[in-house]
UniProtKB/Swiss-Prot annotation:
Name of this protein: Putative 2-aminoethylphosphonate import ATP-binding protein PhnT
Top-rank taxon, per record: Bacteria
Keyword flag NADP: no
Domain ABC transporter intervals: 19-250
Membrane topology value: Peripheral membrane protein
UniProt organism field: Salmonella typhi
Organism taxonomic ancestry: Bacteria, Pseudomonadati, Pseudomonadota, Gammaproteobacteria, Enterobacterales
Purpose of the protein: Probably part of the PhnSTUV complex (TC 3.A.1.11.5) involved in 2-aminoethylphosphonate import. Probably responsible for energy coupling to the transport system.
Keyword terms: ATP-binding, Cell inner membrane, Cell membrane, Membrane, Nucleotide-binding, Transport
Gene coding for it: phnT
């Protein structure tokens, strides 16, 4: 979604501020697009909101920015209730996907725009512009115009303009979606470096790209149909997703039918009947019953055991696809299809071969249907 507004010009701020959404609700013409949502983003934290188109993630960001009036709930930035404050009084800055640079202004003047709107002293403006351009690696381009820059360079300038006003919070609305793959990859690294240099900055990052979220975020929230259906630390959410949608949206996952048999002597692990075998898996919920699912990431499967506690599925190889450093195998496990991704496989197995697929108990997660 392209937006003409580029940034919310923040008043100069000191220290760090988090974001608290308290039962935030948004409706357009009586149609609820964001169901009551409660979420806390800690000071200095990067939270990525991901989800399919129409899931509500951009609505959340626009509500925090002040461009959407909530139908209910509260928005706090730091200790301040900003629910009914105009955007320019919220102490934040925003970067969107279409850069929205002023074409008639040089790079340095684009970066200085928010500071001049604040009527800051000239010496301070020059200092902040110099620092911001240095931070994003654009010092040598200060006197160029936007049309003389690549897409990646323009986005760096947009980020420099946002951080120059020293916001408490930085909002990023799919800032890399208009870039090609290689530039997008480089910009992900640039944003990660930016946060290392500005660790006090709280960032709300909206994206549909799971790689961006996994690379940049301390925590991830997954949206679906106007609701937050999963939220947690990035690694924990990836390795132990709470439900099928989260498992399949955040990376590729094998989802198999399973029956929980009961707890084991190891905290967090349960015995599970799955794939024609009794295995052990991680569980966050109930430990008994039918209608469960087992989630295993393709890269967590191997052709050799990694420990004395490894689980094993017996499988028949259906197809092999070699892709340079990676080999993708499609296997049949008790009538269900299982994908695995391997590195440095030599020799390659052949279609029809009988294989043993090994995986660690903590890499298999029992989830609800």
């Amino acid at each position: 979604m392209l937006m003409k507004t580029t940034a919310v010009h923040a008043p100069a701020s000191q220290g760090t501020s988090g974001i608290v959404l308290d039962s935030l609700r948004v409706a357009y013409h009586g149609n609820v697009v964001l169901k009551p949502l409660s979420l806390t983003i800690e000071p200095g934290e990067v939270l990525a909101l991901i989800g399919p188109s129409g899931s509500g993630k951009t609505t959340v960001l626009r509500a925090v920015a002040g461009f959407v009036q909530p139908a209910g709930g509260r928005i706090l930035i730091g200790d301040t209730d900003v629910t009914h404050l105009p955007p320019y009084k919220r102490g934040l800055a925003m970067v969107v996907q279409n850069y929205a640079l002023f074409p008639h202004l040089k790079v340095e003047d684009n970066v200085a725009f928010g500071l001049r709107a604040q009527k800051q002293p000239k010496a301070l403006i020059n200092e902040r512009v110099t620092q911001a351009l240095k931070t994003v690696g654009m010092s040598d381009y200060a006197t160029r115009y936007p049309h003389q820059l690549s897409g990646g360079q323009q986005q760096r300038v947009a980020i420099a303009r946002a951080i120059a006003v020293r916001p408490r919070v930085l909002l990023l609305d799919e800032p890399l979606s208009a870039l090609d793959a290689q530039i997008r990859h480089n910009m992900v690294e640039e944003i990660a470096r930016l946060h290392r240099e500005l660790p006090e900055l709280t960032i709300l990052y909206v994206t549909h790209d799971q790689t961006e979220a996994l690379t940049l975020a301390d925590k991830i929230g997954i949206m679906k149909d106007g609701s937050l259906i999963a939220h947690g630390e990035t690694r924990a959410l990836y390795h132990h997703p709470p439900n099928r949608f989260a498992a399949e949206f955040l990376g590729r996952a094998n989802i198999l039918s399973a029956i929980a048999l009961g707890i084991t002597e190891v905290p967090g692990l349960v015995d599970v009947s799955c794939g024609g075998a009794v295995i052990r898996a991680f569980s966050q919920g109930s430990h008994h019953g039918y209608n469960k699912l087992l989630c295993i990431r393709p890269q967590h499967l191997s052709l050799t055991p990694r420990s004395a506690y490894s689980n094993r599925f017996n499988a028949t190889l259906q197809s092999v696809h070699w892709q340079g450093d990676l080999t993708h195998l499609l296997c049949d496990v008790a009538g269900e299809t299982v994908r695995m991704v391997l590195t440095h496989v030599n020799p390659l197995p052949r279609v029809g071969d009988k294989l043993a697929l090994w995986f660690e108990p903590d890499d298999a997660v029992l989830i609800e249907v």
